[in-house]
Amino acid sequence: MRLKTSLLKEPKHRELVSCVGWTSADELYSCSDDHQILKWNLLSNDTSVVVKLQDEIYPIDLHWFPKTVSGKKQAVAEIFALTSSDGKLHLVSKSGRIEKSVEAHRGAVLAGRWNYDGTALITAGEDGQLKIWSKSGMLRSTLAQQGTPVYSVAWAPDSGRVLYTSGRQLVVKPLQPNSKVLQWKAHDGVILKVDWSAVNDLILSGGEDCKYKVWDSYGRLLFSSAPHDYPITSVAWAPDGELFAMGSFHTLRLCDKTGWSYSLEKPSTGSLLSLCWSADGTQLAGACGNGHVLFAHIVEQRWEWKNFEITLTKRRTMQVRNVLNDAVDVLEFRDRVIKASLAHGHLVVTTSLQCYVYSAKNWNTPLIFDLKEGTVSLIVQAERHFLLVDGAEVYVYSYEGRLISSPKSPGMRMDILNSQSISLSNDTIAIRDTTDERVVFLFEAQTGKAIGDGKPLIHKIEVVLIALDQCGSSNDRRIALIDKNRDLYLTSVRKLGRAHSIYKIGSMVDTMAWNDSANILCGIQDNRFTVWYYPSVVFVDKDLLPKTIFTKDSSEFSRPPQMVSYVGSQVTVRRVDGSLVCTAVSPYPTLLHEYTSSARWEDALRICRFAKDQTLWSCLAGLAVANRELSTAEVAYAAIGEIDKVQYINFIKDLPSKDSCLAHILLFSGHVQEAEATLLQANLIYHAIQIHINLYSWDRALELAVKYKTHVDTVLAHRHKFLQDFGKQETNKRFLQYSEGVEVDWEKIQAKIEMEFAKERERAANSSVRSSVSVRR
Amino acid sequence: MAKDPLAEAGLHFDELNKLRVLEPDVSQKTTELKEECEEFVDKIGQFQKIVGGLIELVDELAKEAETEKMKAIGARNLLKSVEKQREAQHQQLQALIAEKKMQLERYRIEYEALQKVEAEQSEFIDQFILQK
């Protein structure tokens, strides 16, 4: 990926250009020290003078009023804020008329920024003050005051905090008074420019020490560049938060959000005083110190999937190469390509007006449909459909181009979703809330409605990354999430009446990804490459989890890597320095998942015997129990030496009725409550009581016995025996109360128990023969 | 000879017998003086012209020398700046080379990883074939 730059032969401005700003994807305004504001139309290649300012106005910073204001979208921006060296703040209309001028600071006003919803404007001055203004240019408050000039300022994604420079330090100050101010030394020279991405919440800074740095919003350093030859004069995040651009003297760099650089250009521009991305993220403009205005767009972006390699060769042209036979197809588009995604055998490309869907089988005839807004910021694909984040809404389309659903949630800012905060599977959409990061909303993909009772999943602490598994039935849909403590959790999406049980399956997990063809999870855990061959095993047999994990050393990935894809048996990881590293995962687990999902248990056993791998056997054991396939489970447990479990499975197999069988399988997986409910539903009350006696949960056993008025004496007898064995006195008040009226007679109790079993056997015999056979098969 | 009464009256006759107020000698001398004066003025004029031309010439020369001097200084500066330019270009190219080197390193790592995967896979295939 690189930037293709273009410069006119002769500069249009006579003096240095100080600031630029896009109105639409093809129209740019630029201000210069020659007091002129120029309008650049990229479609017609026209440049016209909008207005000639008064001679005492030397513009310094320009910022257009944001287009999206509280969900409503304006087609074009109408007004911009212009700050000048005489200490004034001007609000200028699109036609160049100065609507309002206010005396803002003593000395020059060095920066002026609107917040994301357009309700406030902040200005930073040479006098070291930060002032907040209303939309109409009325002074609201002075946020901060310091002894050194504030060179640059940026709003937080939630518009509730402000980042500004203070000499060599960066300061994050909340708007609310008396809240904690975050301040840290960021550079060895004066910091000249900062930017804060709304999408990924990362901070970018560049200064006179000739370095640029990437920080998270807590002020932790994520990346620091090597020193350049000249001070960094401008930095700018791309709107989708995946890339940023950095400008210096005769230097323009395109970097990944993790800091490493995609490409370096050396245009003769003088210092790049300001950089600005167009709203769709395809164009970049730079204000040059020698009077030029620099335009750049991204080319040679690449997408890979299985044997296809796609390159964006020009703005409107893509080249598809099939690596297997070197066949090359060229795809032409009517407009500029804004976003593209290649996965699950489909290529989805969006331009400013349309969406093209290609199938990997046929590159000639795309399916084309019109977009609603045309500012797609994210494409997420699943096997059956894909999702577009278009402006302030999320749309799910089928690969046939049919709009399936559009999930909505009040108060959510869909336009700042990124690939880490949204996940799509064939039946479910998971979206992390943008305001409260602990909350994950779950939607049905087919209808766009919230799943179940509509309550979102609420985690203990902030969630960093969410991912839905891609295969299997919708009832078994699981969501994996990494929280701020870097712990990996797994929970099921549809709870089906059960309580939301969430299991921690890993800690110190940097990144993770689900496989596209089987429910296998891979990640980097504590510097080791880890594959959870069957993560859902925590729902059936928690003890098996460590045995179903495959790990290997991941020093080749360096820290902290990013998972790019996990397709088939190949994992692609991007290292911190930007290089892609592939690694292969054993194909057996995928095969095993395939066999078990189609109930080919014999084949599953055969593959385990062939591979002779304990992890694989553990996997099979879990899969078999989950599918209530007891004989396979028995073999698998025997293979991994879990004799106690084999015994229990044998015991379950011998149980006379289907219901108690089911209950004991649930009990095997540790779901006591569900097991009890199953038994009570089947009217096997004694069995339910027995479960609790065996688990020493005496209170519940007695409660049940009293409630159903049966076997109270049995419970008391067992309790008595238990106390005797341990030489203890009865202290439980309820037991004392009931033991008074009941006489314990072991013979009678034994007889009663015998009777219960006989009754159960009888009932099982009466029920259809077929069903009992299916249970025991 | 007796005194000419006319001469006493201050009147004289010249050779052409025209009545004159001035003595013929004086008159002649006056004329001579006049002529000489004219001659002198002429000569002075000529001299001035010549000197003027000379000054012009010298001035021109001076100008030319000046421009040549400026040219020389300019050339010298240009030489210096070319050196600087070359340095800058060198710097730029170095930066570009460093960038390409980084890219190369990335590709090398990717290639190595892929080679490893290939080796693993062929090993797997061999194992698979042997066991069957």
Curated annotation (Swiss-Prot), chain B:
Domain of life: Eukaryota
Coiled coil regions in record: 74-123
Assigned GO CC terms: acrosomal vesicle; axoneme; centriole; centrosome; ciliary basal body; ciliary base; cytoplasm; Golgi apparatus
Single Gene Ontology BP annotation: cilium assembly
Tagged with keyword Transmembrane: no
Main location: Golgi
Protein keywords: Cell projection, Cilium biogenesis/degradation, Coiled coil, Cytoplasm, Cytoplasmic vesicle, Cytoskeleton, Differentiation, Golgi apparatus, Spermatogenesis
Compartments (UniProt record): Golgi apparatus, cis-Golgi network; Cytoplasm, Cytoskeleton, Microtubule organizing center, Centrosome, Centriole; Cell projection, Cilium; Golgi apparatus
Function statement: Involved in ciliary process assembly. May play a role in the trafficking of ciliary membrane proteins from the Golgi complex to the cilium. Regulates the platelet-derived growth factor receptor-alpha (PDGFRA) signaling pathway. Plays an important role in spermatogenesis, particularly spermiogenesis, when germ cells form flagella.
Protein name as annotated: Intraflagellar transport protein 20 homolog
Organism, scientific name: Danio rerio (Zebrafish)
Gene that encodes the chain: ift20
